[in-house]
């Protein structure tokens, strides 16, 4: 069934997200800055992917975009607007995004910052009632393999006038 398939995708993404935390911070320390996304990359609305944040610089590749690559096992494709509830929740789940880590050039996040988060973590936060707001224009279409567009749209700071119809497999 569709729900079972969704649960399998969510479980796989959640496990990958947990394992990707160290990989992502390692990539951050080694990846050169890039200021533009590939024009072929699309957001959840099937439009060109927009920048999530340049300050702090976010994204698995730390280029400001929530582009998902084959190396990004955690699917860091959701452009989320940090708030105190989500920062506390993700810290309680083992991913402290609020404490600076100068060794990794990580400034620590505060409420209002935009950050690319794992699709699985966003779903966990949604299930726990603490999902942060999202920027649909800056969230990768790749997250739709494990998240529902309707759920993202309900938390959007940039809700569309209408949602594109879902594509059937």
Regions found by a protein language model. Give the residues of each.
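Bacterial N-terminal signal peptides that target proteins for export
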Residues: 2-15
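Short, compositionally biased
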Residues: 122-145
């Amino acid at each position: 069934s569709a729900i079972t398939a969704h649960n399998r995708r969510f479980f796989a993404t959640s496990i990958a997200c947990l394992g990707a935390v160290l990989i992502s911070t390692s990539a951050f320390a080694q990846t050169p800055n890039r200021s533009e996304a590939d024009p072929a990359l699309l957001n959840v609305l099937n439009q060109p992917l927009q920048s999530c944040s340049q300050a702090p610089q976010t994204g698995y590749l730390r280029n400001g975009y929530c582009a998902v690559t084959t190396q990004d096992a955690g699917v860091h494709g959701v452009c989320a607007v940090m708030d105190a509830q989500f920062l506390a929740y993700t810290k309680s789940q083992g991913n402290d995004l609020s404490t600076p880590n100068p060794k990794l050039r990580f400034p620590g996040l505060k409420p209002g910052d935009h950050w690319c988060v794992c699709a699985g973590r966003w779903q966990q936060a949604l299930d726990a009632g603490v999902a942060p707001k999202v920027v649909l224009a800056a969230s990768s279409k790749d997250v739709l393999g494990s998240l529902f567009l309707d759920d993202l749209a309900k938390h959007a700071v940039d809700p569309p006038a209408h949602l594109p119809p879902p594509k059937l497999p």
